[in-house]
Amino acid sequence: TGGTYYLHVLTVDNTENKKEVISERIVITSVPKNWKKTTSNDPEWYDYGTEVNAPKLGTGMTPIVYEGANKPTEKKWANAITEDGSMWVWIPRYAYSITSGYHSSSTGTIEIKFLKESSNVAYDGTSTWDNVSGQGKWNIHPAFNYGQEVSGIWVAKFEASPEGATTSTSNSEYNGTGKKLQVKPGVSSWRSITISNIYDVCKNYNSALNSHMMKNDEWGAVAYLSKSKYGKQNEEVWINNSSNHITGSAGNSASASQDTGTTTDYTSTQGVKASTTGTVYGVYDMSGGAHEYVAAYVNGENNRLIIYGKALINGETKTKNVYEKASRDYYED
């Protein structure tokens, strides 16, 4: 069983002298069901279908591979766990182009070119980018900057929940910073918490890993990659329609009404359709689930920003996206 342990050894010699030794802290990570630990040089760890930046494992992170039913052979985004058993997915640095459907209500298409390390040079050799809005324009995705350019980002595989969460919604309704978050399937996600407290809880999770509340552009980076040929592409991510907000759940269609045909088995044939890849290796809960907030706001001096998002407003620039108020935005209260 995963947890923190200490080895306690008591020895007694021939003259009955006793010696007691207590070891340093030993952390045993609980591996999710149907997954196993692996190494960073395991060729089975990930496969994006093309060359990408190797995932950067932070302190306490361990690569994992899936060993259960519906084991895919492609669209395997890298997965890892932290010491508490939380699950994370690697999004490699890339540039993108919206090739159809730009500023349209119709389903569009997105092309992706993965970039080498923290540079702006693609693996196919492309090094010149438009970096302006518009259909067919190529842009370096802004999510890959956290105070400096980065080679990729780790994102939560499921909606966050408080440690000790169960399938009971009451256990996951907490508006405070006294609990630690986790990222696990099959439990009710964290709700009834202010944006300011979300910001602090995420920052407090693991400072060594630069944990933070997901920014708007980081959420977008996951969505855009899912829409490319390296994700579900032309098939919509199915909705998590669980009324109890059970992480990793899936309805029986992309737009299923609440609790209609819901499965809580994210590894099942139906469950993987709610993943960004259509396989067990993707990110879940991107559609449906609980209401989600990102670390972003319009800088319009709205009083509610101060009331509910003080920590976010006072946070470091790299931890948030701030947008300027448009000339027609007159809302002050």
Language-model features, listed with the residues they occupy:
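Acidic glycine-/aspartate-rich tracts in secreted/extracellular proteins
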Residues: 14, 94-97, 158-162, 296-299
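Extracellular recognition modules
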Residues: 6-12
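Short, conserved beta-strand/loop elements in beta-sheet-dominated catalytic cores
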Residues: 87-89, 93-95, 209-221, 258-333
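Extracellular fibronectin type III
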Residues: 15-30
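Short aromatic-cysteine micro-motif
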Residues: 84-85, 107, 117-286
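Surface-exposed, short loops/turns at beta-strand junctions within beta-sandwich domains
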Residues: 1-4
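N-terminal module-boundary/linker segments of secreted carbohydrate-active enzymes
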Residues: 29-136
